[in-house]
Amino acid sequence: MDKIVEINQVTKIYGKSNEKQTQALNGISFSVEKGEFIGIMGASGSGKSTLLNILSTLDKPTSGTIQINQEDVTKLKGNQLADFRAKEIGFIFQDFNLLENLTAQENIAVPLSLQGVKPKIIKQKVHQIAERLSITHILDSYPAKISGGQKQRVAAARALVTQPTILLGDEPTGALDSKSAKDLLDTMEELNTKDHVSILLVTHDAFSASYCQRILFIKDGVIHQEVKRNGQSREAFYREILTILGNLEQ
């Protein structure tokens, strides 16, 4: 399989050399294969949020390299980096990050508009992804008029409309009720298995993580443990994840 993301010996140190320093990441290496659904877990302060920020190119490592689609993103700067991020990386955040003065349809279209795509093509692409996520009936609605679960589906559509190399989820179910969370996770799993969308999910929630094929557990800035689902039922994988999380906290 093709490696679409390669992280090699990434470290991140906060603070100047003459001040008190904090090492958030300490030599992390792993890769993501095309079509993989991978989870990142760890307690608060473990380094998982720092890793996500570096993966999403919103922060730079102190040392090490990150390759996405065979491009070393640590060498990109300014507009070049912004263009790469817009085309190659999709984001789903916990708090949706929708623009309240735009309809669902307009929110989904934003990344394509920024890339200068023609309006006719934008409309086609927006309707295609909206159909895929079962939200065509709310395309003319504003965020204030739709539910949390629907908002997150709009956010997912916006993230996927550019057909990015990888979809990054930062606690995407965190603001949802249990039914909406399950619906979103079922959709993400379907996008992964049927459309081969590559997904990296950062979460503290064992139920969300049980949808992944492989999970990296981060502790003290290093990969403490890795576990694969290997054909287990989701219930069995969920129990295994809970056990590992319990051991991590000891």
Positions of predicted regions on the chain:
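A short, proline-enriched helix->beta-strand linker immediately N-terminal to the Walker B motif
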Residues: 161-165
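Catalytic Walker B motif of ABC-type/P-loop ATPase nucleotide-binding domains
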Residues: 167-170
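Helix-to-loop junction immediately C-terminal to a conserved catalytic motif
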Residues: 56
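Hydrophobic anchor residue at the start of the ABC signature
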Residues: 156
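Short coil-to-helix segment of the ABC ATPase nucleotide-binding domain corresponding to the Q-loop/switch region
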Residues: 102-110
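Conserved ABC transporter NBD signature motif
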Residues: 64-72
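Conserved ABC ATPase signature
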Residues: 142-146, 150
